Amino acid sequence: MLSSRFLVLGAQFSVLSALDYHHTPVLLTETLAGLQPHPGGWYIDGTVGGGGHAAAILEATAPDGRLLGIDCDPAALAAAAARLAPYGERVTLVRGSFREIGRLAHKAGFVQVQGVLLDLGVSSYQLDTPERGFSFQASAPLDMRLDPDAPMTAANLVNDLPERDLADLIFRYSEERGSRRIARAIVEARQRRPITTTDELAEIVSRALGGRRGRIHPATRTFQALRIAVNDELTSLDAALPQIVELLVVGGRMAIITFHSLEDRIVKQFMRAEAQAGHLRLITRKPVEASSEEQRINPRSRSAKLRVAERA
């Protein structure tokens, strides 16, 4: 039986749907070493996902530590509710975006906390569920929304943006050098009929770039760019970071896990600027990366980078 806090703040998500949710938390040991959760501490996981990191934090903060978990994906919250149910009233789950982490935390009673975690990666469940449209490994609707109730999909961008704007978007959010060729190919294809599936878009991009050359699929960067744009990910990160600093007590820590250079650059520059201003102390001078063993077990951890800073 779920606690009342799940029912009140977790809103309308089904615990039964969590049975199919799978996601291996990356850099788990390193994240705990960075956050240093302790008994009785209050922590926020701004991207709670399936609850892997959150469960480890709750174990470390027993018997009376508290955790607020935030996620915009109802499937993720369902998984977190099921996984974290044994911790009862120590857990509060809220549906929302981490870009509003300050408001959501205050509303839930988490005004000053000992630590905040953001894991910015797309979960294995989201990647491996075809209808979510994040992957080109299967034919699926061109969606890519982390929040399934958000108004804009990748199909909207691909079919509606002017060619120049589409090229700029792809380059800005993926640094894809062939962005103009890709945009031209997309516009030519959509003039014949709307582009509606992931495999269709992947084939268009692959042809525009001359086919596959190496381990990485030619459409990988374009899919990344569209996902970032659909979910406004970089703007959300920019908005969240200063709010996190305000939530931390002196000595409290923020741990941010990124998965591409654009995110990591934002986090690195923010932490360095705040350290120079005397608001933060850098715990990781260089990003922490997954061990070779973790990369072998979980290949999706290869691009993960962890940065940690402490409130001064």
UniProtKB/Swiss-Prot annotation:
GO cellular component, one term: cytoplasm
Xref: Pfam families: Methyltransf_5 (PF01795)
Residue spans crossing the bilayer: none
Record-listed S-adenosyl-L-methionine binding positions: 51-53, 71, 98, 119, 126
Region feature (Disordered): 289-312
InterPro entries with a match to the protein in the record: RsmH (IPR002903), SAM-dep_MeTrfase_MraW_recog (IPR023397), SAM-dependent_MTases_sf (IPR029063)
Subcellular location: Cytoplasm
GO molecular function, one term: rRNA (cytosine-N4-)-methyltransferase activity
Coiled-coil annotated residue ranges, if any: none
Catalytic reactions of this protein: cytidine(1402) in 16S rRNA + S-adenosyl-L-methionine = N(4)-methylcytidine(1402) in 16S rRNA + S-adenosyl-L-homocysteine + H(+)
SUPFAM superfamilies to which the protein is assigned, alphabetical: Putative methyltransferase TM0872, insert domain, S-adenosyl-L-methionine-dependent methyltransferases
Keywords per UniProt: Cytoplasm, Methyltransferase, rRNA processing, S-adenosyl-L-methionine, Transferase
Described function: Specifically methylates the N4 position of cytidine in position 1402 (C1402) of 16S rRNA.
Protein name: Ribosomal RNA small subunit methyltransferase H
Organism (species): Roseiflexus castenholzii (strain DSM 13941 / HLO8)
